[in-house]
């Protein structure tokens, strides 16, 4: 039987911008994408710590080292600059193949979205 497990998480990133008129998605600094084992265009769940909003979108490439976390398109209505968010990816795995010591990649960031 397959189960869904957390694959990666960027914890308490600070939203640096919100662009309502952009086509859609979430722009994320590629240093954070790589550190969390995520991929460009991968589906993500986003939780806004400030207002409780939860939504799904996909990642687009942000400039490395920029700390950029931008809510684009309709997602811009669910958060604003300065909000803290959690970005989560999931994977489908065979339950019997999931190692007992499985650990997802979790990236904690500082107030400028630099990996701690």
Curated annotation (Swiss-Prot):
Keyword Zinc-finger: no
CDD domains: Asp_decarbox (cd06919)
Enzyme Commission no: 4.1.1.11
Active-site residue list: 25 (schiff-base intermediate with substrate), 58 (proton donor)
Protein residues bound to substrate: 57, 73-75
Modified residues (Pyruvic acid (Ser)): 25
Enzyme class: lyase
Pathway the protein contributes to: Cofactor biosynthesis; (R)-pantothenate biosynthesis; beta-alanine from L-aspartate: step 1/1
Reactions catalysed, as given in the entry: L-aspartate + H(+) = beta-alanine + CO2
GO biological process: alanine biosynthetic process; pantothenate biosynthetic process
UniProt-listed SUPFAM superfamilies: ADC-like
One Gene Ontology term of the molecular function aspect: aspartate 1-decarboxylase activity
Record note on quaternary structure: Heterooctamer of four alpha and four beta subunits.
Family listed: Belongs to the PanD family.
Protein name in UniProt: Aspartate 1-decarboxylase
Biological source species: Leptospira interrogans serogroup Icterohaemorrhagiae serovar copenhageni (strain Fiocruz L1-130)
Biological classification of the source: Bacteria, Pseudomonadati, Spirochaetota, Spirochaetia, Leptospirales
């Amino acid at each position: 039987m397959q189960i869904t497990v957390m694959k990666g998480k960027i914890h308490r990133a600070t939203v640096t911008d919100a662009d309502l008129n952009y086509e859609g998605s979430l722009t994320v600094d590629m240093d954070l994408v790589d550190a969390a084992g995520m991929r460009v265009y991968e589906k993500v769940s986003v939780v806004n710590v400030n207002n409780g909003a939860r939504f799904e979108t996909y990642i687009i490439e942000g400039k490395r080292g920029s700390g950029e976390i931008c809510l684009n398109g309709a997602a811009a209505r669910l958060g604003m600059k300065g909000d803290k968010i959690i970005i989560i990816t999931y994977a489908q795995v065979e339950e019997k193949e999931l190692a007992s010591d499985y650990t997802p990649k979790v990236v904690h960031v500082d107030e400028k979205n630099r990996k701690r």
